[in-house]
Structure formats: structure tokens, C-alpha cells
Amino acid sequence: MRYLCRAQLLSLLLLPLLKARLSVPAHPIPKIFLPLMISTWNYTDANREAWTVLRQGPRRTRQAVIQGCLHCQNSNSCGRLLGGHSAPDSSGGITLEAALIDGANMDYGAVAGMAGIRNAIGVAHDVLRYTNHSLLVGEAAARFAEAMGHKKEVHSLSTTLDVLLPWLLGKCQPNFWRNVRPLANDSCGTFSPLPQEQHQREMRQEYPIEPGHHDQVGFLALDTEGHLHAASLSSGARFRIPGRVGDAAVPGAGIYADNQVGGALATGDGDVLMRFLPALLAVEALRAGQSPASAAEAVMRRLLRHHTEFNGGLVVVSRGGVYSAACAGLDEFQFVVSGESSGRSMRRVEGIKCLDRHEVVTGGPRGNFYVVPKKIWAAGGEDVLVQRVEKITLNEGVDSREFEEEYVEDKAAEIDVDEGEKAEEVRSLLDESPGDLLLHQLGLAPPFPFRFPFIYF
């Protein structure tokens, strides 16, 4: 009887844990075993090349991710931007960037803004092996590459001009300038800064990510002994301002790996990725005990709270080979996974649907949302600072926005308006701005009192 009670007690203690382990994660645990090779986007040939190296045996993770990058930079199988010299900066310059990280000791090597050297990942590897630095940039990076034995090449001018000339004829749209004169949305420059008082906070312009037109690719390899390496390669954003460094070269932005917990690959708007270091955040979320699925989603939601129009994706892998992904702004985010199951090599293209960015930002469904004006008096005489009216129409994947002024706060507030002086003051303030549009759309009208929400973005 005593042993029966112990068994019953043990079952009661373990049952919740067993249920938790058996619950279905947001992204199903893959039926693929180690070793594991993951690469961003639907570039199966490059993934296959990397996998061929990885499955030769343990401790081949570094060579595997390098081989994947080499395949992309030496062929057109990873889209014409990476292999075809068709991602020039605004002056027509062709530069590359690449990075490599070792999850065992956190060694890191990267190059950025490097012109005339095709083998960017090889130079990044040399930075890791032969220097105490982490990142070399520009002409000095090219000189370092030549000293390491890499040959300088002349890029195809005709290919570059085929891309650059239509852009120049189209008044250099799109570009990456703001708060300058002449207006960046109608000119090629030369630009000069606007005075500070004339600066406007505009919604960040995001450029659509089209299939086969990616300017960055990432690879992550995990072997049977738990060794991790990650690598990235990028041609840089098209028509970028010369001198710009992208996320592919910045630790934690495009790639990160730590043998103790796992690794991550991020891709998309590099200037946003560099501000949040999502690959690093995801790995640290794993360290804190989150699953790859929850880590990926949490990081993506964090990006969206600050940059609602972000386009891109994130893949997170645990040290045990469980992986998941999250994305925003795309119809679908694809990545390629190769591994072994029952002694046989398996490869598949994973595709996930992206987060509904509007639910992240507004916490609500599709429809019409309004944000109302200025500083108005709440009941009790408190000042509440809000944004001027912004209408956001959220239909089936179509966004239309009307902006009047800059963001103010990143939280919601409600205001009770009572009859009397405060109500009249609120009413007059609303009349002075587009706030009457809000009242009309919400079906609210005088006489007061009324109650309505303020939705922040």
C-alpha cells in the first residue's frame, strides 16, 4: 500500500509535465534528426551543397555553411541579386558583405562594403582565422583580402547599368533618404539636410521582398555532437547610400549561434534588424527557457511593435535540432531544411504564414481604426498626450494609411469626458483637428458624456 501511494504521488507530480511535453508546439517538431542544415529562402541547390559537406561527418559545420555561401556567390541559383552583380548602390558601386560565427567559442569574422572581391565569405573566414578583429569594411577590407590571396575581379558593368539606368530615369525611386532637400521622393539629389524644425516623422518605407530577388541568405549547421556554425552572405540593399553596412555583417543581426543553447538566422530589412539584433535575441530567449517557436514569435512581435511595416523572417534552432520560424510582411516565408531520418538524407522546403502585423500593433481584428488628436483634458483635469488622427484601413492584406503627425506613446489609454467646461474644451479641440472624423466614424456625437478608446501604434 505504501508503494502504491508513492506511485500515485509520482504520477500526480509527473502528469502535468508529461502533458506539457506532449502538447503540440506552434511549429511542429520536425521528424528529422541530426545533423541538420537550415538555410533561408527557397534555395534548395545551395542547401544541398552545404548538406553534402555536413553529412561527411562531425565537425564539418564550418565548412558546410561556407560551402552554402560559396554556391550562392558563384552561381545564379540564389537569385540574381546575390550572384548577378545586380544590386548596386546609388552610385553604381557593387559591394558584398558576409559573416561567419562559431558557436563553440563565439569567434566571429565579417566583411562589409567590400568591392572587387567575389569570395566575401572566404574573406570573412580569414578575418576570423587570421586576425583579432570581428569586422573589416570598405577598401581596407579589399586590400586585406588581396593580402590573403583572394583575386580582385572586375564586375560586369553592363549588368549593373541594366539595373541602375531605369532607376535613375525614374527619379531614383525608391531611395533611402529623408528630411533632405530637394524632396527625396521626387529627385536624385544632390541632397542637403533640412533644418531640424522641418523634419517630419514619416512611416518607414519598406521595399517588397519578391521571390528570387533576395539580397541576403543565411546558413546554419548543427552536427551530431552539438557543434553549431552560422554564416550569411549579402549583396546589400539595392540603391543603398554608398558606405552603408547591412545586417549580414553585424553580429546578432543576421546570424548568431551558441553551442550551449542554439542558433538563429534573420533576414529582411537589414536596417531594422541591426537595431534589434533579432538573431541574438532569439538565442538568448532559448537560454531563458523558451522554445524555438515562442522565441521566434516573441522576437518578431517585438520588431513589429516598433516598426509596423517590417518585412522579413527569423528561423530559430535549439541545440537539440528543434526549429521554428516567424515572419512578417510576406505572403509566406520559406526556408530549406536538410537532415537525416532513419539513416536517409531528407530535404524539404518549409513555408510558414506570417504574423498578422495588425493584430500585433492594434491588438484587434481587421477593420478601420482611428487615433485622435493632440493633448486633451481627461476627467479629473489630467493632461493626456495623444497623436493626431490617423486612419488605418486593414483589409485583406491591403493597408492604407493617412498620417497627420508623429507617434507619441506606445500604449493605450481611455478618457472619460463629462459635461461642463472640460467637455466643451475637448469638443473645441476636436473641432480644430480631424477629430470630428473619429466621432463620425465611431457613431459618437454630442451631447456629452461619451467614452472612446485611443489606439496607439
UniProtKB/Swiss-Prot annotation:
Q: Identify the keywords attached in UniProt to this record, alphabetized.
A: Disulfide bond, Signal
Which GO terms fall under molecular function for this chain's record? N4-(beta-N-acetylglucosaminyl)-L-asparaginase activity
InterPro entries on file: Ntn_hydrolases_N (IPR029055), Peptidase_T2 (IPR000246)
Q: Which Gene3D superfamilies match?
A: (Glycosyl)asparaginase
The SS bond pairs are 72-78, 172-188, 327-354
> What does the entry list under GO cellular component?
lysosome
Q: Which SUPFAM superfamilies match?
A: N-terminal nucleophile aminohydrolases (Ntn hydrolases)
* Signal peptide start and end residues: 1-20
What the record says about family reads:
Belongs to the Ntn-hydrolase family.
For this entry, the protein name equals: L-asparaginase-like protein GA18140
Organism, scientific name? Drosophila pseudoobscura pseudoobscura
